[in-house]
Amino acid sequence: MGGGGGGFPEPEDSVLFRRGTGESDDSDVWDDTALIKAYDKAVASFKHALKNGDISEASEKPKGTPKRKSAKNKSQRKNTTSPSKQWKVGDNCCAIWSEDGCIYPATIASIDFKRETCVVVYTGYGNREEQNLSDLLSPTSEVANIEQNAQENENESQISTDESENSSRSPLNKPNNIRSRAAPWNSFLPPPPHMPRSGLGPGKSGLNFSGPPPPPPPPPHFLSRWLPPFPAGPPMIPPPPPICPDSLDDADALGSMLISWYMSGYHTGYYMGFKQSQKEGRYSHFN
């Protein structure tokens, strides 16, 4: 562009922000790890509060820790607690993870008999934590906890399965009722013909219809007596018939289309002939 003051600015003048050129550029600004951890922590705290019926802050579980139910009460822990003199290094046990209060299987790595404490390594996670010997639980505690969780999960899945079956069963019972209600005539237009059960296909020369042939046209006096006059507004167009799962075959669709063409031409020809006969009757009356 020209050098006048009213010209457009150069492309570099329109840049609002360019990453990596400023002195205050900080790559940590683009790291959302802390945000993700905060969100996961908030969700875990909310779920933990719902399970226990109270509000308590739940921090991160051991690495890869699945969801486990916390111990119901302290009496359950005391019933499964073994005396401290029975524990030795390498024994399998169950310990309560201090971060979430849930029971996990662990192995005793070291024991301090003077302080009556030990260091346990959580099986499958590798986390190490110091525990009191009196707080250790027998391995059967974890088995009972897993069985209880499995039973609760099975009950929840059964409830959700029953609800989905009920919701899917209710609409399946309606097509027969819909068809029976749609049978009576709602206007002066005749009901659609029955769907043919067979039609064109490989090795077939034509259509074979199982339904009876269309009835002959009614006489004019019957038509004028029983059919109401045409409305003054636009003609009423019936809605298309519902698509049934058993009529989604190509041959059935083709047969339905040919039937509709035939019925349309049939009624159109009858109406045109009826109007022609009326017109000829008026001419003969004047002559």
Swiss-Prot record:
Residues bearing the modification Phosphoserine: S24, S27
PROSITE patterns linked to this entry: TUDOR (PS50304)
Major localization listed first in the record, in broad terms: nucleus
Pro residues bias (residue ranges): 211-221
Amino acid composition bias (Low complexity), ranges on this chain: 149-160
UniProt feature, compositional bias: Basic residues: 64-77
Biased segments, Polar residues type: 167-179
Gene3D superfamilies: 2.30.30.140, Periplasmic binding protein-like II
Keywords from the named record: Cell projection, Cytoplasm, Isopeptide bond, mRNA processing, mRNA splicing, Neurogenesis, Nucleus, Phosphoprotein, RNA-binding, Ubl conjugation
Single Gene Ontology BP annotation: DNA-templated transcription termination
Span list, region Required for interaction with SYNCRIP: 273-287
Glycyl lysine isopeptide (Lys-Gly) (interchain with G-Cter in SUMO2) cross-link, chain position(s): K47, K204
InterPro entries: Smn1 (IPR040424), SMN_C (IPR047313), SMN_G2-BD (IPR049481), SMN_Tudor (IPR010304), Tudor (IPR002999), Tudor_SMN_eumet (IPR047298)
Required for interaction with RPP20/POP7 as annotated region, ranges: 92-204
Region (P1 (binding site for GEMIN2)): 9-40
Region (P2 (binding site for SM B)): 234-261
Tudor domain sequence ranges: 86-146
A Gene Ontology molecular function term of the record: RNA binding
CDD domains: SMN_C, SMN_N, Tudor_SMN
Known function: The SMN complex catalyzes the assembly of small nuclear ribonucleoproteins (snRNPs), the building blocks of the spliceosome, and thereby plays an important role in the splicing of cellular pre-mRNAs. Most spliceosomal snRNPs contain a common set of Sm proteins SNRPB, SNRPD1, SNRPD2, SNRPD3, SNRPE, SNRPF and SNRPG that assemble in a heptameric protein ring on the Sm site of the small nuclear RNA to form the core snRNP (Sm core).
Family statement: Belongs to the SMN family.
Domains: entry comment: The Tudor domain mediates association with dimethylarginines, which are common in snRNP proteins.
Subunit structure as annotated in this protein's UniProt entry: Homooligomer; may form higher order homooligomers in the dimer to octamer range. Part of the core SMN complex that contains SMN1, GEMIN2/SIP1, DDX20/GEMIN3, GEMIN4, GEMIN5, GEMIN6, GEMIN7, GEMIN8 and STRAP/UNRIP. Part of the SMN-Sm complex that contains SMN1, GEMIN2/SIP1, DDX20/GEMIN3, GEMIN4, GEMIN5, GEMIN6, GEMIN7, GEMIN8, STRAP/UNRIP and the Sm proteins SNRPB, SNRPD1, SNRPD2, SNRPD3, SNRPE, SNRPF and SNRPG. Component of an import snRNP complex composed of KPNB1, RNUT1, SMN1 and ZNF259.
Protein name: Survival motor neuron protein
Organism: Bos taurus (Bovine)
